[in-house]
Amino acid sequence: MAERGQILVEGFSDQKVVQAILNEHERDLAFDVIYRKGHEGYPSLRESFETTLTKNLDIRGLGVVADADHDVAGRWRSLADVLRGAGYPGVPDTPDPAGLVLESHSSSMAELPRVGVWLMPDNQSAGMLESFITRMVPAGDVLWDLAERSVDECYDIDPRYPAAGSREAHCPKALIHTWLAWQTEPGKPLWQALLKPSLEPGVDHASFRAWLGRLWTVGSAQGT
């Protein structure tokens, strides 16, 4: 069995955050976290996912970490179509709250690896990587309350900020970077912020770590 796996992500920050969580895992999970430099974002990620599944790569597992953005159901359908098109059986119609993992499969087109899909932040909610990080801010943090008020005010007075229809998904990006700018060491990147005691890993962080472990472990997929 191959001793390395791959996780495909949308961009640099996603790569660094996923790698930071892999590094803190109690098990040695040898995943290479990959994105296409110069082609960041979901369309490129989906294309890479589709292409990788046709290559008959000798890898232990292939994971995809994508932002749900404002349409969780639509994003899931897009990735589920890739899985079904590649020949995986039993692809669910809705995302698994714990993150999808399907075992390896021999199709008429390719030898398919164990595969997993995680939609940021929690496979159920609109949002993105930054939404996942914001949920680690301690409850009652006074600077967080101030950041929320400040960002709300910006939305009201400046048309450069997202329109109302996309605020729910994109507001966490403005919030977390505003909050990080006010820390003792201001402006730390998201992946470095994970190492600081000012953040408190919670349920979503634990679920994501568990998903990584299942993606690595033979026989841990749904229905096995």
Question: Model segments located where?
Answer:
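C-terminal accessory helical subdomains adjacent to catalytic cores in phosphodiester-
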Residues: 2, 21-32, 46-61, 68-224
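Short alpha-helical
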Residues: 13, 40, 124
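RNA-recognition motif
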Residues: 34-36
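Short hydrophobic beta-strand that contains or immediately precedes a catalytic carboxylate
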Residues: 7-10
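Conserved helicase/translocase motor-coupling segment
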Residues: 38-45
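Short N-terminal binding/cap micro-motifs at the start of the first secondary-structure element
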Residues: 14-18
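An acidic- and aromatic-residue-enriched active-site/binding cleft used to recognize and process polar
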Residues: 12, 38, 67-69
